[in-house]
């Protein structure tokens, strides 16, 4: 990334949005991208674009499974989750959202033209509504349903 390019200013705007909205995840992400842009960007950014989402999903999955691994959630708790309507609803919604995210990944890889709008929407959601950046996958999944594709 060239210093003071349009890309620089867009990222700077996102960093400022992160600071204004007190969303450190967004601000730290932009700072990391600034640093990466000075260290062989032609080598690093293609790798980040290809593998960072998979790495993030891996880390998120580890975080979700950690209570089971630590024993805070045991087999009995898992079994009991099938005995309460709220838990069953949670299971069904979890299945639906996972399926939706899969559709989103497919749409984003087959129609990259939609990625920009999804990213801008996600960043605005993170900056102003205290959202988390899992939005592009779910948003792309919803978009795929709306478009009737994938």
UniProtKB/Swiss-Prot annotation:
Q: Does the keyword Cell membrane apply?
A: yes
The organism is: Hamiltonella defensa subsp. Acyrthosiphon pisum (strain 5AT)
Q: Where in the cell is it found?
A: Cell membrane
Where does the protein principally reside? membrane
Top-level taxon in the UniProt lineage:
Bacteria
Membrane-topology descriptor: Multi-pass membrane protein
One of its Pfam families is DUF441
Q: What family does the database annotate?
A: Belongs to the UPF0756 family.
Identify the HAMAP family for this entry: UPF0756
PANTHER family hit by this protein:
UPF0756 MEMBRANE PROTEIN YEAL (PTHR38452:SF1)
Which keywords accompany this UniProt record?
A: Cell membrane, Membrane, Transmembrane, Transmembrane helix
Detail the disulphide connectivity of this chain as listed in its UniProt entry: none
A GO CC term? plasma membrane
Q: What is this protein called?
A: UPF0756 membrane protein HDEF_0364
Q: Which residues cross the membrane?
A: 1-21, 28-48, 51-71, 88-108, 123-143
Q: Which InterPro entries match?
A: UPF0756_TM
């Amino acid at each position: 990334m060239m210093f003071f390019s349009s890309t620089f200013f867009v990222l700077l705007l996102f960093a400022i949005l992160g600071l204004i909205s007190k969303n450190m995840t967004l601000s730290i992400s932009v700072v990391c991208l600034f640093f990466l842009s000075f260290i062989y960007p032609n080598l690093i950014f293609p790798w980040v674009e290809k593998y960072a989402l998979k790495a993030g999903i891996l880390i998120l999955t580890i975080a979700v499974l950690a209570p089971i691994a630590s024993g805070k959630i045991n087999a009995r708790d898992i079994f009991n989750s099938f005995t309460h309507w709220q838990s069953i609803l949670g299971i069904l919604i979890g299945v639906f959202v996972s399926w939706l995210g899969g559709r989103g990944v497919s749409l984003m890889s087959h129609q990259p033209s939609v990625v920009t709008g999804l990213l801008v929407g996600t960043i605005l959601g993170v900056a102003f509504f205290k959202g988390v950046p899992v939005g592009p996958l779910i948003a792309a999944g919803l978009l795929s349903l709306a478009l009737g594709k994938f």
